[in-house]
Amino acid sequence: MKQVVQNYKSGELAVLDVPVPGCKPGGVLVRSAYSLISTGTELMKVSEAGMSMLGKARSRPDQVAKVMQSVATNGVPATYRKVMGKLDSYTPLGYSLCGVVEQVGDGIDDVKVGDLVACAGNEHALHAELNWVPKNLYAPVPDGLAPRHAAFGTVGSIAMQGVRQGEPQLGEVALVIGLGLIGQLVVQLLAASGVRVVGVDPDPVRCELAERLGAAACGDPESAAVEAAVAELTGGHGVDQVYLAAGGGSNQPVELAARLCRDRGRVVDIGKCRLDLPWNAYYEKELDVRFSRSYGPGRYDPAYELEGRDYPIGYVRWTERRNLACFLDLVARGKVDVEPLISHVADFDDAVETYQRLKDGDLKAITALFRYPEQGVEAESPALAVPTVNVKPSPARAAKTPVRLAFVGAGNYATSMLLPHLTQREGVELSTVVTTTALSAANA
């Protein structure tokens, strides 16, 4: 099958032929129909890969800290090999798609082969023709909802979780700073919740779009029109809640939030902007600063995401899977309109060119979609059942016959520390590598 990958060392993008993932218990194998390119988070990752080593270090201080810790533990040579091995391997892209169930793993009873599902996760909803997706990271698509619209499920869940963190109430007024993809969805979700919205973005085209999609007023962060709109809608008290859906290194969004929020209002960070809080402004108003973690409760919990252990609805009403299903329902019922957010649709074979145009600025888009070949071609994937293996003693071999090895597991440590030593040894031949993901097999 084909998959979009990027070499993080060189920044090179490619569409590779990689092995088809197996359909493991607790999940489904999905053939992609549409996958979504996030022009915010995802494009930032693509741009970072094209930076110099110094630029990469400056953009990811968290990774630099891990490298320094590894140097202290393992020494410089081992750390260098590990880091360069990680950088010089292919990394996947994508995290939001819609597709058709191709195979159903053991323990799955809520979907069947041929059903349309929306899938989430930066390890399971990749820009690839086929993905294995665990139960809690997919949701059935409601009848009548177009696959291109269902592909917004993941980013819709991100916006929805941010709105839930703000706890909006009927009649309140909210400020949304940043009117990119997530900001536009937040505007619509708030409007659907009975909240009047003021949007802020330096791009007048995005401001106009947000007003079409339900915002009461929008404007440039530097303009007096935004403050005037807030004063008019709130009687001069300030907005009840602010949603930070902007990115970048400017501290302006955080400062603007404090200036336009009412006393004891709520500020929710959804994007990845600078957060140097002006202490006096936040203290004097006793503002409640909250963070929104990705798609919702369950995110980053392996027991939930990989093992399929759901949280009881009485204790956790909105998990990431229930957020995903809820967003799809809102789009299907016309409460949220994603069609105006689709700036470009590209064939999957043109993925590299599309990324390059987005990166270079030749293609201006709030979001873009990859369209995959028509459904119906069966995947050449391993059978669900694990075959019985009969172990027999190996016959004696000639002294100069190479030892043929099969290697199970090809993660970062194996590919940087173990496999290089094995493949360089005289008389050793690596015949087979078995891994859980298609891309780790390709890297090996």
Task: Report residues per predicted region.
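C-terminal capping/lid region of NAD(P)-dependent oxidoreductase domains
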Residues: 4, 232, 236, 241-243, ...
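Glycine-rich beta-strand-centered segment in the early N-terminal region that forms part
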Residues: 21-36, 45, 49-122
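Short, well-ordered loop/turn sites that connect or cap secondary structure elements
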Residues: 37, 111-112, 168, 261
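Mid-domain Rossmann-like dinucleotide-binding core that forms the NAD(H)/NADP(H) cofactor-binding site
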Residues: 116, 123-124, 146-223, 228
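Glycine-rich cofactor phosphate-binding loops and adjacent beta1-alpha1 units
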Residues: 166-168, 208-209, 213-292
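Conserved acidic E/D residue at the C-terminus of a beta-strand in Rossmann-like folds
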Residues: 201-202, 293, 432-436
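C-terminal substrate-binding/catalytic core of Rossmann-like NAD(P)-dependent dehydrogenases/reductases
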Residues: 277-341
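N-terminal Rossmann-like dinucleotide-binding module
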Residues: 381-444
